[in-house]
């Protein structure tokens, strides 16, 4: 049996020796790691200095329960101004009839949407996790918390897309209340218009989780689900949308009251006012620079995919041009699987993640067939197609062990040191920097 009391005594003694400088030292180590690495995690990005200024403001100490003009706390007149700006910017950017900017994460936004659109016991249809779906769309996460029955779309792994004809057959039989589109692994536009038609035939809603492609939608480089028939669009604001880690919900005006009540008092109380202000600044940056940024993101992803393919890798989506987003997916089974390849690349200074692919079972989560690559962060620091080809060459050398780890790390560091300034922003500040505020 584990000695709980002994463990507590050990950690208590360690805690006595801790001080804030220990934390700062760890953060500095992490910052250096990111500065010297090539970050290709598809769900991360960098915020500008203007956005980060908001994080350390007094807003981070405050609460503002309720809606604009209808708060349960006093002292919120400036908060109301900020939230009003956030709502109007969101509506403008996404051409939305209604927007709620209070969700503090993508999963929270999805949970709110489930509360707004479904009842306990309803059936929903989503993309399975191996085919790219997010865990919050499934029984193990938000959908399960709402008490929903989850069925999965028939999926064409060669096209990396929902099979619409087969979906119609399943939908006529199962009668889902809600169709969810949008993915964690997403390479191409999804059939929103076609699913809208099916939904209308059986009286269902359509929801699109745009977390990964929100910035591409804002930059007009990807489909706008709201314009193609989605009732609700959720999305986290820190992936291709280069803002703080929080989320938005955009919807048809007829659903405004349902959405707002599902958010508060449903799943959000305080909504982190400092990052809300940061979102406003990021949205302004997106209006100013988003189109150029989004187009370059897609160009970079295509360039990386094409170079990896030319080096002999099994890049998914070949028949459709590999990708239309920030992501590239590669089948690396012949090189030991996603676990081995992700670790080898991390040792070389390239940071990405292993990923299930459509033919994998959930039992393969520990060592799936693939890796997922995202270029949105390296694009924000100014990298373009030439650098994508260089990254592919380094990846190839690491995976096939053509060079030593030290040689590879030096190549990564030499490439990265030319890119340490945030672009597509009002202030071109240092990208990887832990400020001393004393």
Swiss-Prot record:
Q: Which GO terms describe its biological process?
A: glycine biosynthetic process from serine; tetrahydrofolate interconversion
**How is this protein annotated for GO cellular component?**
cytoplasm
Which EC class is the enzyme in? transferase
Q: Which residues cross the membrane?
A: none
Q: Which reaction does it catalyse?
A: 5,10-methylenetetrahydromethanopterin + glycine + H2O = 5,6,7,8-tetrahydromethanopterin + L-serine
Marked site, Plays an important role in substrate specificity, at 238
Q: Which InterPro entries match?
A: PyrdxlP-dep_Trfase, PyrdxlP-dep_Trfase_major, PyrdxlP-dep_Trfase_small, Ser_HO-MeTrfase, Ser_HO-MeTrfase-like, Ser_HO-MeTrfase_PLP_BS, SHMT-like_dom
- What is the name of the protein in this document? Serine hydroxymethyltransferase
Q: Per the UniProt entry, what species is this protein from, by scientific name?
A: Archaeoglobus fulgidus (strain ATCC 49558 / DSM 4304 / JCM 9628 / NBRC 100126 / VC-16)
Q: Which gene encodes it?
A: glyA
């Amino acid at each position: 049996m584990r000695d709980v009391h002994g463990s507590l005594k050990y950690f208590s003694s360690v805690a006595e020796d801790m001080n804030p400088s220990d934390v700062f030292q760890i953060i500095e180590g992490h910052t250096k790691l990111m500065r010297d690495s090539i970050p290709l995690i598809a769900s991360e990005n960098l915020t500008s200095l203007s956005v980060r200024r908001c994080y350390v403001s007094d807003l981070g100490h405050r609460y503002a329960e309720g809606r604009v003009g209808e708060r349960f706390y006093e002292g919120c007149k400036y908060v109301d101004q900020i939230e009003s700006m956030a709502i109007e910017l969101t509506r403008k950017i996404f051409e939305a009839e209604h927007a709620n900017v209070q969700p503090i994460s993508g999963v929270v936004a999805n949970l709110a949407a489930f509360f707004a659109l479904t009842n306990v016991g309803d059936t929903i249809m989503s993309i399975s996790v191996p085919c790219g779906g997010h865990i919050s769309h499934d029984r193990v996460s938000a959908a399960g918390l709402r008490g929903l029955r989850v069925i999965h779309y028939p999926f064409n792994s060669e096209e990396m897309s929902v099979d619409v004809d087969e979906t119609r057959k399943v939908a006529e039989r199962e009668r889902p209340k809600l169709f969810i589109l949008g993915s964690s692994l997403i390479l191409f536009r999804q059939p929103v218009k076609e699913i809208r038609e099916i939904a209308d035939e059986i009286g269902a809603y359509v929801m699109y989780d745009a977390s990964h492609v929100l910035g591409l939608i804002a930059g007009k480089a990807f489909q706008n689900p709201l314009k193609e028939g989605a009732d609700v669009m959720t999305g986290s604001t820190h992936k291709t949308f280069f803002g703080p880690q929080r989320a938005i919900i955009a919807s048809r005006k007829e659903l405004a009251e349902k959405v707002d009540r599902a958010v508060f008092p449903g799943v959000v109380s305080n909504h982190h006012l400092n990052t809300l202000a940061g979102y406003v600044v990021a949205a302004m940056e997106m209006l100013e620079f988003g189109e150029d940024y989004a187009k370059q993101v897609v160009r970079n992803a295509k360039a990386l995919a094409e170079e990896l393919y030319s080096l002999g890798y099994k890049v998914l989506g070949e028949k459709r041009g590999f990708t239309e987003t920030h992501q590239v997916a590669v089948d690396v089974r012949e090189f030991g699987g996603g676990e081995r390849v992700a670790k080898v690349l991390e040792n070389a200074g390239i940071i990405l993640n292993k990923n299930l692919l459509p033919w994998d079972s959930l039992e393969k989560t520990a060592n799936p067939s693939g890796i997922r690559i995202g270029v949105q962060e390296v694009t924000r620091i100014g990298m373009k197609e030439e650098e994508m080809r260089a990254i592919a060459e380094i990846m190839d050398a690491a995976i096939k062990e053509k060079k030593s780890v030290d040689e590879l790390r030096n190549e990564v560091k030499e490439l990265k040191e030319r890119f340490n300034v945030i672009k597509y922003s009002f202030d071109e500040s240092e990208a990887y920097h832990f400020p001393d505020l004393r």
